[in-house]
Structures are given as structure tokens and as C-alpha cells.
Amino acid sequence: MPKRKVSADGAAKAEPKRRSARLSAKPAPAKVDAKPKKAAGKDKASDKKVQIKGKRGAKGKQADVADQQTTELPAENGETENQSPASEEEKEAKSD
């Protein structure tokens, strides 16, 4: 491969960087597909409505049950909950 000629001032020019055609080509635009399954989509929407109605009732019941369970659970980290200072005094009075 022949070297580039040195210019009059003696400095060598840098070779231009070349890229392959594959890398320099612009990426293909994304294809936008039309949705031809409109009839199938309508069927799915009607099915979803039926399922949602069924789920709403179940969720409401589950939420009530969950609320009851959380109130009955002891304190976190194994600590006992103190219900009120008055109840502790009553326990001490009974033990005397």
C-alpha cells in the first residue's frame, strides 16, 4: 500500500477513517402493522367485561377478610402489643 505524500510543511496527513457500507447504512424504518383482527378484539373486550364484574365482587370480599386478618395479627418482630396502660394496672391489681 503506497504511503501518502508529505505536504510542503512536512506534516503527514492522517488517513480518513472508513466505515463499511453495512455500518454506514441507515437502519430500516420500523414497519407499522395495521390491526386486521378487529372482530377478534371486540370479542375479547366483551369477555373482559364479564370477567371484571366477577372479579370486583371477589376483590371486595377478599379486602374485607384481609382487613380482619391484619387486625388480629400480633405486632411485628414478635413483640407483644400493649392494648392500654389501664389494662396493665388491672392485671397488677388482680395479682396482688
Curated annotation (Swiss-Prot):
Residues 32-50 have a biased composition (Basic and acidic residues). The keyword Phosphoprotein applies. One of its GO terms (molecular function) is nucleosomal DNA binding. One of its GO terms (cellular component) is nucleus. The modification Phosphoserine is found at residues 7, 20, 24, 84, 87, 95. Its main location: nucleus. The modification ADP-ribosylserine is found at residue 24. The modification Phosphothreonine is found at residue 80. Keywords: Acetylation, ADP-ribosylation, Cytoplasm, DNA-binding, Nucleus, Phosphoprotein. It is found in: Nucleus; Cytoplasm. The modification N6-acetyllysine is found at residues 13, 26. It comes from the Eukaryota. Interacts with transcriptional regulator SEHBP. Binds to the inner side of the nucleosomal DNA thus altering the interaction between the DNA and the histone octamer. May be involved in the process which maintains transcribable genes in a unique chromatin conformation. Inhibits the phosphorylation of nucleosomal histones H3 and H2A by RPS6KA5/MSK1 and RPS6KA3/RSK2. Belongs to the HMGN family. This is Non-histone chromosomal protein HMG-14. The lineage of its organism: Eukaryota, Metazoa, Chordata, Craniata, Vertebrata.
